[in-house]
Amino acid sequence: MQHNRISSPASMLADPTRAAIVLALMDGRSRVAKKLALDAGVTPQTASAHLRKLVAANILACEARGRFKHFRIAGAEVAHAVEALSELGAAAGRTLPPAAHELRFARCCYDHLAGRLGVAITERLPLLGSGVLAELGIDLDALESQRRPLSRCCVDWTERRPHIAGSLGAALLRAYKDRCWLLAIEESRKLVVTPRGRAMFVERFGVDEALFAAS
């Protein structure tokens, strides 16, 4: 039935342990079951049972590397759905947990930038010329030839406004990291803006300097 296409994946994420496991993987990296058990605060046996269900539901993908299995988000569409569900929870009036405040300014949303900085850049993009993207080594024609959509709006669960996803969103985040404008934090979705990154986001993208002062 049509409603099963919604209810089945939603029921997978309704369980707090499975939700914690999926959210731990929203930085786009893969992890072993033992680490995900620690992230979710459960035993390895319990985590393994939940991981099997998430893989069977095509929410997570599993890859064997030597003796260990590594788990990751199954794809961009899954990450987009998880972010949308997170935004629905925020819109329902739930208070953000303390850990979420650390992620609010800049974080990975699977393979693109989210948070206040991600939203601010997204709002500035239509005002910028293609030269800014070219300076970052981003080839729009090459991105448009991919099967993945060039851009799409991903509603930010902390800001409740859209940030850019799609192949362009992923290319932008890669460019920021390659130029050390943003630094990833190990085992976290949080991204740190470097002094050079702050200067470049203000100079090249026109992001308000006050945004960084308030972070």
Predicted regions and their residues:
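Basic, amphipathic "hinge/linker" alpha-helix immediately C-terminal to the N-terminal HTH DNA-binding motif
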Residues: 63-88, 197
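Beta-hairpin "wing" of winged helix-turn-helix
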Residues: 55-65, 72, 185-186
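Base-recognition residues in the alpha-helical recognition helix of bacterial helix-turn-helix
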Residues: 23, 48-49
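Accessory beta->alpha helical hairpin/"wing" motif in late/C-terminal subdomains of nucleic-acid enzymes
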Residues: 71-74, 127-139, 186-203
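N-terminal helix-turn-helix DNA-binding core of bacterial DNA-binding proteins
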Residues: 4-43, 69-71, 108
